[in-house]
Amino acid sequence: MAANLEDVPSMELMTELLRRMKCSSKPDKRVILVGPPGCGKGTQSPLIKDEFCLCHLATGDMLRAAVAAKTPLGIKAKEAMDKGELVSDDLVVGIIDEAMKKTSCQKGFILDGFPRTVVQAQKLDEMLAKQGTKIDKVLNFAIDDAILEERITGRWIHPSSGRSYHTKFAPPKTPGLDDVTGEPLIQRKDDTAAVLKSRLEAFHVQTKPVIDYYTKKGIVANLHAEKPPKEVTVEVQKALS
């Protein structure tokens, strides 16, 4: 239910009004982000969201929200999950359709984590066509696997604080120890070379047909994701301008 405006603090209300005024002149955009783990999507996504006044739609988050809100689609999704089944493509597309109706999605969206297959891409296109819209751009965060391995397998975490380090790019003062507490650092299970290799193999097999599908439509922008974040941001802005 919408909040009573009288109960919203003035500063929050003013900030939101200014945001909407700034966004009113922005062109609508519907963008898909594609890229392997560690490619930098997470760094660029909030910048794209703020710059172009888009909402960020991550399929995992949307599914959890729909289940928690007990929407009709969320109830169906929970039934599938409780049985240990995958949530059907039609259900996921329906949940995306629901999410797109939010006020924050008026100027368009960034879709992250979907589509993962050509069939999903086709179903998404069909749903958007019914609304008279389409995907405007697919940002492909292209990066060599060897660079990803260096990025990811060098990551170390201080468990209790969440502080992160990298053996090459942001090393601790003393190898293997947290700068503040001197406690040992750990590596996430997913950040090992063996786990990364299998994740990347699965990603390439699954994603290449999707990129080919959108390339035929002429809407893929291949980004040099190995570059420093600020340079990637410049490429993103050029691709979306």
Curated annotation (Swiss-Prot):
Binding-site positions, AMP: T59, R64, E85, L86, V87, G113, F114, P115, R116, Q120, R188, R199
GO molecular function: adenylate kinase activity; ATP binding
Chief subcellular location: cytoplasm
Region (NMP): 58-87
EC number: 2.7.4.3
CDD domains, alphabetized: ADK
Any one biological process term the GO annotation gives: purine nucleotide metabolic process
GO cellular component, one term: cytoplasm
InterPro entries: Adenyl_kin_sub (IPR006259), Adenylat/UMP-CMP_kin (IPR000850), Adenylat_kinase_CS (IPR033690), Adenylate_kinase_lid-dom (IPR007862), P-loop_NTPase (IPR027417)
Compartment(s) of residence: Cytoplasm
Keyword ATP-binding: yes
Start and end residues of each stretch annotated as LID: 154-191
Annotated ATP binding sites: G38, C39, G40, K41, G42, T43, R155
Annotated function: Catalyzes the reversible transfer of the terminal phosphate group between ATP and AMP. Plays an important role in cellular energy homeostasis and in adenine nucleotide metabolism.
Family: Belongs to the adenylate kinase family.
Name listed for the protein in its UniProt record: Adenylate kinase 3
Protein species of origin: Oryza sativa subsp. japonica (Rice)
Lineage: Eukaryota, Viridiplantae, Streptophyta, Embryophyta, Tracheophyta
Gene expressing this chain: ADK-A
